[in-house]
Amino acid sequence: MTTRYKMTMAYDGHLFHGFQLQPDQRTVQGTVEDALKKMTKGKRIIVQGSGRTDAGVHAIGQVIHFDYPGKTIPANRMILALNSMMPTDIIFNNCEIVNENFHARYSIKGKWYRYRVSLDHFVNPFKRFYTGHFSYALDVGKMQEAAKDLLGKHDFTSFAASGGQIEDKVRTIYYVNIAKDEKENEIVFDFIGSGFLYNMVRIMVAALLEIGNGRRPVHDLKRVIAAKDRQEVRQTAQASGLYLYHVFYDEYHKNIDRTGIYN
C-alpha cells in the first residue's frame, strides 16, 4: 500500500546541478529522495518532478509527486517532516494527498516561467546568482511589441537548444509580459505556455533583448519562428535569471494582472 503525495516546493538553484538525479552531483531530486530514504529506513522512493530545471535555475513553484509506502502520513505532517530535513536552499510550501491518476509531469496543462535581467552597469555581486545581466540600452516598448509574435501555437524549433529529447517542437504560448522594475533596476519577463522546450525561455529572452537593443527588427521573431533553425538565435540568456514560477494542473487561468500576480 502506498499513498501519493503532491508537493509544491521552492529552491535556490545556485548550488544545485539541476533538478534531475545525477551520480555524484548535488541535485534537487537527489536531496529529496535522500530525505525520503531516511524516513523509510532505506527504501528508495522515486520523486517525479513537473520539469527538470538546469543547473543554476531556480523555482518558486516546482511540483513533485511520490508514492510513500506503509501507513498514510497526514499531509500537514509530511510537509513538516520533509522541511525539517531539507537544506536551507529548499523549502516545501504545500502538500496534498492525491489519487494515483495524478502525475507531476504528465498531468500538466501549462507552466509559468519568469526571467529577471539586471540592468546595472556592472554585475551586482548580490544579484549575480539570481538574475541575468544586460548593461546596454533597451527599449522595453519594442520588446513588448515583439513578444506578441510569440503568442499562439507555433513550431518553436528555432528556440530549442540541442540536447533536448523531445521531437515535437510545437507549443502554445498563452501570455507574455515584459515590464521594468524601477526599484530593482531590472527587466522582468513572464511567459505562460502549454509547455517549453529545452532552454526555450532563455533563448526567447536572448532574442527579445537583441530586439530591445536594436540588433534585430521589432518583428524579426516571425521570421525566426518560420525558419525553424536554431542558428537564427545563437545566444542563450544565463541560467541564473530563470525561475519556474507556477505549474498549472487545471486549464490556464487568465486572471493574471500586469504585475504578474496569479490569482
Curated annotation (Swiss-Prot):
Pfam families: PseudoU_synth_1 (PF01416)
Catalytic residues (positions): 54
Gene Ontology molecular-function annotations: RNA binding; tRNA pseudouridine(38-40) synthase activity
Keywords from the named record: Isomerase, tRNA processing
Gene Ontology process terms (BP): tRNA pseudouridine synthesis
Top-level division of the source organism's lineage: Bacteria
Signal sequence segment: none
Gene3D superfamilies: Pseudouridine synthase I, catalytic domain, C-terminal subdomain, Pseudouridine synthase I, catalytic domain, N-terminal subdomain
Keyword flag Isomerase: yes
Entry EC number(s): 5.4.99.12
Catalyses which reaction(s): uridine(38/39/40) in tRNA = pseudouridine(38/39/40) in tRNA
Binding site for substrate: 113
Summary of the function given for this chain in its UniProt record: Formation of pseudouridine at positions 38, 39 and 40 in the anticodon stem and loop of transfer RNAs.
Record family assignment: Belongs to the tRNA pseudouridine synthase TruA family.
Assembly information from the UniProt record: Homodimer.
Protein name: tRNA pseudouridine synthase A
